[in-house]
């Protein structure tokens, strides 16, 4: 057994140990959150070994541990694919989860079921790692469904609140739609290629639209692309550590990761590439517009995630899977940090999430505010922060791309809007006058709060540089670009900041005016939730009610038993007799008959002898 295999298996053992321990009585005797945090920390340190080995040798590995069963000629084995995507994602996910886990021990300290919460977070991470390292579709599907069910349990953690239950159900139902696409693709591969192994699928490389459409539907559901996006802002009902983990390195990037994993198939199909490009462009613009008018700090960050996922889908649409993966890795650092800074501020202000009731947090919480600003600047692609290394490359690739100009244009507009809503958070939360109660006592001295944010702040500054150094050489030709194209990313970011600052200054002291149609559109999330969650279900319910009324009450209960019985009896009686119910006529006929008999008897009595 070589060093790569043994270190990967050691990481797996380290991560599963806390879950096994949680099934015994040991968590009552030890500090379970600290134990789980330590196990993830050591897993991260251990994951650096295979990462450096991979960068040194640049060789992919496949670890096959256990042959499960054979169905006809399909072999199902538990095998791990250790390539550039899975090995780098392993280290990034472990680093981010280490910080989130430590943050959870501070944020959830008063929760009576904190041990179970930590266990769920661990399982969430493990299912995501199963998904990223799977070498066959069956194993990938186990990770896919595991991520879905764990998100359901964690979003609905505070199950006493109706909103949390609704949000959890919403997440699982929208993901069911995506799962239909995944199962469709699995079925097609099974029937046509007789295998679920990724190598076999890529080797045959049939340019068929059906499985790729199924995979795109799956990615749309899991990564909250336009059409199946409403569950993502609703998922903010869960605790802040859940939001941080869900949006940074698990769940929402699973759909994008799936499309990256299948890029050898998608790159040969221009139809699916165009579909990905247009879908991503619509998503990134729509969610950026929605983020502009939100007042809940967590919802703004959630919509920013959705917008970045749209940008990743656009990157896949212009056939740049390595760039999309680079953006996943860089995005994980500052997005987790933004959520943790938001959670720290919310916790300190007695669970206040409205940015209009914050202000001047730079004086009250200098460390958290500084990290919030670093995260927001990294999100906008400020030069030499982490986001710049992926976002700048993506915008350069968009500028030099020769497909679909409208999709690329609205992507650039949405990128400019990123700066607008990031500036809005900075302005309302850290600047201006304080708008919260002076009785609130604020304390940010807990090491379980400071250390995780500090680590992620460091990652938000350096990680992009370190990761971009290690992108494997690709066959993309080196381009020389005019300076105005090269500076596009920076220019649209600065433009967004300038517009946001000017608008914030203009609207700070103005009285409330009647909202415009565009403002109403953005505030009500494009009227999508009322249409999808109110009008369509109501119409469906009404039509179902009328249909069931006609089928059950009018047809079955009335016409089948009571009416059919009476109609049958009437028809039979009409066939069997001609009586019409005319009593006088009947008596008259009796009278005539009796009179005739009497007369005949009188005239001829011998006839009756």
UniProtKB/Swiss-Prot annotation:
GO cellular component, one term: mitochondrial inner membrane
Subcellular location field: Mitochondrion inner membrane
Membrane topology category: Multi-pass membrane protein
Cross-referenced Pfam families: NADH5_C, Proton_antipo_M, Proton_antipo_N
GO molecular function, one term: NADH dehydrogenase (ubiquinone) activity
GO BP, one annotated term: mitochondrial electron transport, NADH to ubiquinone
Protein name as catalogued: NADH-ubiquinone oxidoreductase chain 5
Organism name: Rattus norvegicus
Lineage, uppermost ranks: Eukaryota, Metazoa, Chordata, Craniata, Vertebrata
């Amino acid at each position: 057994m070589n060093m790569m295999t043994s270190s990967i298996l050691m990481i797996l053992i380290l991560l599963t140990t806390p879950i096994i321990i949680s099934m015994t009585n040991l968590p009552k005797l030890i500090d379970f959150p600290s134990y789980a945090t330590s196990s993830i920390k050591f897993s991260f340190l251990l994951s650096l070994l295979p990462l450096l080995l991979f960068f040194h040798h640049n060789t992919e590995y496949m670890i096959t541990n256990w042959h499960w069963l054979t169905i006809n000629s399909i072999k199902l084995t538990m095998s791990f694919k250790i390539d550039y995507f899975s090995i780098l994602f392993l280290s990034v996910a472990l680093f981010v989860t280490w910080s989130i886990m430590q943050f959870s021990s501070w944020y959830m300290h008063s929760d009576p079921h904190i041990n179970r919460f930590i266990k769920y977070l661990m399982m969430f991470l493990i299912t995501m790692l199963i998904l990223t390292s799977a070498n066959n579709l069956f194993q990938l599907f186990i990770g896919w469904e595991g991520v879905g069910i764990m998100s359901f349990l964690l979003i609905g953690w505070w199950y006493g609140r109706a909103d949390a239950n609704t949000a959890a159900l919403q997440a699982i139902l929208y993901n069911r739609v995506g799962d239909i696409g995944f199962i469709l693709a699995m079925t097609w591969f099974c029937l046509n290629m007789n295998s679920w192994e990724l190598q076999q699928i890529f080797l045959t490389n049939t340019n068929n639209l059906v499985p790729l459409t199924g995979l795109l539907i799956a990615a749309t559901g899991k990564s909250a692309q336009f059409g199946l996006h409403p569950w993502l802002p609703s998922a903010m009902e869960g605790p802040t550590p859940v939001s941080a983990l869900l949006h940074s390195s698990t769940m929402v990037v699973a759909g994008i990761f799936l499309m990256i994993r299948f890029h050898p198939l998608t790159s040969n199909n221009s139809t699916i590439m165009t579909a990905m490009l247009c879908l991503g462009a619509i998503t990134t613009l729509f969610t950026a517009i929605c983020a502009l008018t939100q007042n809940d700090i967590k919802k703004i960050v959630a919509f920013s995630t959705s917008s970045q996922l749209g940008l990743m889908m656009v990157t896949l649409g212009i056939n740049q899977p390595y760039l999309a993966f680079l953006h996943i890795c860089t995005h994980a650092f500052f997005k987790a940090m933004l959520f943790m800074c938001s959670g720290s501020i919310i916790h300190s202000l007695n669970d206040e999430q409205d940015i209009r009731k914050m202000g001047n947090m730079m004086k009250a919480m200098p460390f958290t505010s500084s990290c919030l600003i670093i995260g927001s600047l990294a999100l906008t692609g400020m030069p030499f922060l982490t986001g710049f290394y992926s976002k700048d490359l993506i915008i350069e690739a968009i500028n030099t791309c020769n497909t679909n100009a409208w999709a690329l244009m609205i992507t650039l507009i949405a990128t400019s809007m990123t700066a607008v809503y990031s500036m809005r958070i900075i302005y309302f939360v850290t600047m201006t006058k304080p708008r919260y109660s002076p009785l609130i006592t604020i304390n940010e001295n807990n090491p379980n709060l400071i250390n995780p944010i500090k680590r992620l702040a460091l990652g938000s500054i350096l990680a992009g540089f370190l990761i971009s150094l290690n992108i494997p050489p690709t066959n993309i030709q080196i381009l020389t670009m005019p300076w105005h194209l090269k500076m596009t990313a920076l220019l649209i970011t600065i433009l967004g900041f300038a517009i946001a600052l000017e608008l914030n200054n203009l609207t700070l002291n103005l009285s409330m005016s009647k909202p415009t149609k565009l403002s109403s559109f953005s505030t009500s999330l494009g009227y999508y939730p009322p249409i999808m969650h109110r009008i369509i279900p109501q119409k469906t319910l009404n039509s179902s009610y009328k249909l069931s009324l006609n089928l059950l009450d009018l047809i079955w209960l009335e016409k089948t038993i009571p009416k059919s019985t009476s109609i049958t009896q009437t028809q039979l009686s009409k066939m069997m007799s001609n009586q019409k119910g005319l009593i006088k006529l009947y008596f008259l006929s009796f009278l005539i008959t009796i009179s005739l008999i009497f007369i005949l008897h009188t005239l001829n009595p011998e006839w009756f002898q």
